[in-house]
């Protein structure tokens, strides 16, 4: 009984906290779907999108040490090159 009351109070507190902390300064819920997909997309790719996701054959791959860059296709990073 005591645990149940504590759980109910905790859920009510967290729900109230969520509503208080929600940023709805621009009436975000009403404007959530107002823009079309084309208007929401950035016409120019960002720097992250321009970056290669994988290294090609004979490319430098320091990712073997850091774990960031991987080789494309079935290639493996041997030393510092994708082979």
Swiss-Prot record:
Main location: secreted
GO MF term set: ion channel inhibitor activity; sodium channel regulator activity; toxin activity
Chloroplast among keywords: no
Prosegment location in residue numbers: 23-50
Pfam family, one: Conotoxin
Range of residues in the leader sequence: 1-22
Keyword terms: Cleavage on pair of basic residues, Disulfide bond, Ion channel impairing toxin, Knottin, Neurotoxin, Secreted, Signal, Toxin, Voltage-gated sodium channel impairing toxin
Family membership noted in the UniProt record: Belongs to the conotoxin O1 superfamily.
Name of this protein: Mu-conotoxin-like PnMKLT1-014
């Amino acid at each position: 009984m005591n645990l149940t009351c504590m759980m109910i109070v905790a859920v009510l507190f967290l729900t109230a906290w969520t509503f208080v902390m929600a940023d709805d300064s621009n009436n975000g819920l009403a404007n959530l779907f107002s823009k079309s997909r084309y208007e929401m997309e950035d016409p120019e790719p960002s720097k992250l999108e321009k970056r290669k996701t994988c290294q090609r054959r004979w490319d430098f791959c320091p990712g073997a040490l850091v774990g960031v860059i991987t080789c494309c296709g079935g290639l493996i990073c041997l030393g510092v090159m994708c082979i």
